[in-house]
């Protein structure tokens, strides 16, 4: 394949598309394998972008010890971590997977990607008008509408807005940005942290 200049990772399944086990396998472990694989062929000066989600900022947080485990455990050993094996709720699996994406990118930025002179970041979209979002709306539309109404933007985002933010992170204008996340959510997480709305359906 040769050296790769740019890499964008978009694979993932939502809580209404897959079981907790499958979400962790695809969104968390699959992302780890991809970061490792492309970290071996990314060109010097290259850049990568992993599309995550605003849910990585939501409940439940991993403990500091669990965060370190997820960040540093090799991809082929992640499925054995107790903090992941115990998850049975697809919503929690999705939240933890998206938190893990950012942790794994932090590690990659300072190890294989950084050692090759390349950058890697995540972008965390809020509610964006995509087929995946429609699946979630159909399953829990009222809850999503309450969340949208509570945010400062009071609307959903568009693919073009995420594309523009992603293009910036991959561009030379972002050459000093690596190992971090760009939250593009219309203020959803700010509203959540300030008590404007509460998450539901994450009791187990």
Language-model regions, residue ranges each:
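A hydrophobic alpha-helix adjacent to the NAD(P)-binding/active-site core of NAD(P)-dependent oxidoreductases
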Residues: 23-24
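C-terminal helical subdomain
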Residues: 33, 93-94, 99-102, 122, ...
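A short C-terminal helix-loop "cap" of Rossmann-like NAD(P)-dependent dehydrogenase/epimerase domains
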Residues: 72-84, 137-151, 201-203
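Short C-terminal tail/terminal secondary-structure segment
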Residues: 178-204
């Amino acid at each position: 394949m040769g050296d790769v200049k740019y890499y964008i990772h978009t694979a993932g399944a939502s809580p209404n598309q897959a079981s907790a086990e499958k979400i962790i396998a695809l969104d968390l472990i699959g992302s780890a394998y991809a970061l490792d694989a492309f970290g071996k062929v990314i060109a010097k000066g290259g850049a990568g972008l992993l599309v995550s989600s605003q849910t990585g900022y939501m409940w439940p947080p991993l403990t500091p010890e669990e965060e370190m485990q997820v960040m540093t455990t090799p991809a082929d050993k992640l499925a054995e971590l107790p903090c992941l094996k115990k998850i049975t709720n697809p919503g929690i699996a999705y939240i933890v997977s998206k938190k893990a994406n950012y942790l794994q990118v932090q590690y990659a930025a300072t190890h294989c990607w950084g050692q090759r002179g390349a950058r890697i970041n995540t972008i965390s979209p809020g509610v964006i008008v995509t087929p995946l979002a429609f699946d979630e709306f159909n399953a829990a539309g009222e809850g999503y509408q309450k969340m949208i109404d509570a945010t400062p933007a009071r609307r959903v985002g568009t693919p073009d807005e995420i594309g523009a933010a992603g293009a910036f992170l991959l561009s030379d204008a972002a050459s000093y940005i690596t190992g971090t996340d760009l939250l593009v959510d219309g203020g959803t997480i700010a509203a959540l942290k300030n008590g404007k709305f509460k998450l539901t359906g994450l009791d187990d």
